[in-house]
Amino acid sequence: MAGKTLYDKLWEAHEVKRRDDGSSLIYIDRHIIHEVTSPQAFEGLRLANRKPWRIDANIATPDHNVPTTPERKGGIEAIVDQVSRLQVQTLDENCDEYGIVEFKMNDVRQGIVHVISPEQGATLPGMTVVCGDSHTSTHGAFGALAHGIGTSEVEHVLATQCLVAKKMKNMLVRVEGTLPAGVTAKDIVLAVIGKIGTAGGNGHAMEFAGSAIRELSMEGRMTICNMSIEAGARVGLVATDATTIAYVEGRPYAPKGEQWERAVEAWKDLVSDDDAVFDTVVELDAAQIKPQVSWGTSPEMVLAVDQRVPDPAAEADLVKRGSIERALKYMGLRANQAITDIHLDRVFIGSCTNSRIEDLRAAAEIAKGRKVAATVKQAIVVPGSGLVKAQAEREGLDKIFLEAGFEWREPGCSMCLAMNPDRLESGEHCASTSNRNFEGRQGAGGRTHLVSPAMAAAAAVTGHFIDVRELIQGSAA
């Protein structure tokens, strides 16, 4: 009998009942809530005269709509947009009514949902984790089965602590070898998406493995699992190991004492068996990965920084040719244009993909002693949580950014998506550490280029894309 994958083990451990239609009832251990996808769910509970089934399984924070500028210290009334203000206020009221733990807008523990749950230890190995946000796959970095859900499912989880789901296929993405200096987890996952496309992982749980993955910090693993959804997979996974356990130990929600010892022993099995069979296997050589830059309107439209934008005339497939032509037109780029000839109007370092302390350190290393280029209208750094912000300030990273000409902001989703005051104007090019570059994602007509934090900082100080390794070598010289 073949061994089991990590996904198989997590699924079986949480399968309450298998249904006649092939779906299963799955128990949910952790439910993370934010202000955008929860109001209707709470109202549904109220109309049905129900209460949350397990209050302590829920944790909430506002993130999508909150302003990241200093005036937010004035409280909810400082939120200018009426809909945004109402959503944040409604989350506060709903959590207060039902006794759900919420890190409110000006709580130091507030931040992006996918940053605050891991840093609190609320995301643990072996858990099932859901949130009304597609980038819930982030939490799979802990060996947890995590994925996004819709608003109606948010209500189901609140009411029953269960979800109906169908088991997916297993995909293994194996990345072996050593990453070159200046190449990061963000470059790995962008390279994966460039290789398999945004539909490559459809219908699969995507486990990342190999020596290059094992060498990553938890921050790096979260970055990779965060963007598994951009590769088509709802679920991203990394096996639990000593790195995972060291990160979790001592955090507020982590087990303590004897419970901790028992948990660590149980977590040792959160790996795929040596003889486990995967439906699909994808392999990459870490040593061959270069700093990546997206050039188009889909995450799969990504290239190494030393390459050129494709020429649609060279594409035989008419559908692909049309996609390239449309993307070039929207992005205001020319066929065969060098990636390094793309000039930036704005730079955004933040989002649930790249706003943790390691990300800010990497960006600060490039910004230190340099200045934001005069041609760049704005460069902002948005920590993923109040605790990340405080840590960065203890390390003096805020001073490095401010002296270089970056803006140092309060935590939130910020410029990742145009749901708050931080957004692009039409036609502006932005080097962004976020996860999506769809048309209008950062503002109507905005042109998004996905990169790592170090690459974003390098673009900020030069005004155009540059291989960050040139600046690293320059610093060392």
Swiss-Prot record:
Its cofactor is [4Fe-4S] cluster. InterPro entries: 3-IsopropMal_deHydase_lsu (IPR004430), Acnase/IPM_dHydase_lsu_aba_1/3 (IPR015931), Acoase/IPM_deHydtase_lsu_aba (IPR001030), Aconitase_4Fe-4S_BS (IPR018136), Aconitase_4Fe-4S_dom (IPR036008), IPM_dehydratase_rel_enz (IPR050067), IPMI_cat (IPR033941). GO terms for biological process: L-leucine biosynthetic process. Keywords: 4Fe-4S, Amino-acid biosynthesis, Branched-chain amino acid biosynthesis, Iron, Iron-sulfur, Leucine biosynthesis, Lyase, Metal-binding. Pathway: Amino-acid biosynthesis; L-leucine biosynthesis; L-leucine from 3-methyl-2-oxobutanoate: step 2/4. Binds 1 [4Fe-4S] cluster per subunit. It catalyses: (2R,3S)-3-isopropylmalate = (2S)-2-isopropylmalate. The keyword Electron transport does not apply. Its EC number is 4.2.1.33. GO terms for molecular function: 3-isopropylmalate dehydratase activity; 4 iron, 4 sulfur cluster binding; metal ion binding. [4Fe-4S] cluster binds at C352, C413, C416. Disulfide bonds: none annotated. Heterodimer of LeuC and LeuD. Catalyzes the isomerization between 2-isopropylmalate and 3-isopropylmalate, via the formation of 2-isopropylmaleate. Belongs to the aconitase/IPM isomerase family. LeuC type 1 subfamily. This is 3-isopropylmalate dehydratase large subunit. It comes from Pseudomonas putida (strain W619). The gene is leuC.
